Amino acid sequence: MEVPNVKDFQWKRLAPLPSRRVYCSLLETGGQVYAIGGCDDNGVPMDCFEVYSPEADQWTSLPSLPTARAGVAITALGKRIMVIGGVGTNQLPVKVVEMYNIDEGKWKKRSVLREAAMGISVTAKDYRVYAAGGMGLDLRPHNYLQHYDMLKDMWVSLAPMPTPRYAATSFLRGSKIYVLGGRQSKYAVNAFEVFDIESRSWTKFPNIPCKRAFSSFVTLDNHLYSLGGLRQGRLYRQPKFLRTMDVFDMEQGGWLKMERSFFLKKRRADFVAGGLSGRVIVAGGLGNQPTVLETAEAFHPEKNKWEALPPMPTPRCACSSIVFKNCLLAVGGVSQGLSDAVEALFVSDS
């Protein structure tokens, strides 16, 4: 696949969200993007639920989420959207699970989680949902792996994760669930563990070389990229924004040795990232001082270097993001206050 030139990338402003927010969750299904929950200007979780239609460039409000919450885990099962856990209006984790039927336009309560939790990582395969980790009411990280059986409407406990954590990144590849990073209380975890759905067992993979919070993970071809982030301050060490890039080779099963010349051009944490047209993209986030960034860059996997992209029209951090129809969408987040901006990075045909 021919990797596009950075000059061919452009940003486009799309219809803004109906209200400003942060920590909303995005999901693509049936060629549309759904935005669920989030926090308002006062940090109060919201019950908003909207769908974006790319043809009309329009957000349409749908029946409100029965339980207002932010930072929910979401997944699509055919024409149903499942919303799991998150933070409720009392600022505490919830155990509520709700399912929206797209054809009927209705919400239904489903069997609750075994314990209230926020920061759960969710993957789905063959109409089965797998929920890993989370943080409970006592602020302790969970090591639970639970599988939801849609036909029986019940959660079944599977082998616990070797490293308890919340806010991890998980993705499915074949019949394996890869779980990376996350946090325990305020501190970052560099554990990398893989659950085999068929053998129902966990394998520990080599740890992420650089431990940091607010980094991003992107998969592209047979590589997994761990990007940027914040090295947390402890005792005498100051917190530090990072340019670091670690790359895991899925075929060889190991982290590659990285030259400093392969690192990001700009130090950043809490940014938008995704794989787009054969390149790894990072945009916005928080940088030194700390300042909200507008800069964006694209990694060329053959040249092993980052190149500058056009800046984001609205500089911001803590955006929700999704790769959708060959675009990387940056939704909401924090600029000077909360933002309702929706912007798409795409490769122009010209």
Curated annotation (Swiss-Prot):
Transmembrane segments: none annotated. Pfam families: Kelch_1, Kelch_KLHDC2_KLHL20_DRC7. InterPro entries: Kelch-typ_b-propeller, Kelch_1, Kelch_domain_containing_8. Keywords: Kelch repeat, Repeat. It comes from the Eukaryota. This is Kelch domain-containing protein 8A. Kelch repeats lie at residues 1-31, 32-79, 81-127, 128-175, 176-222, 224-278, 279-326.
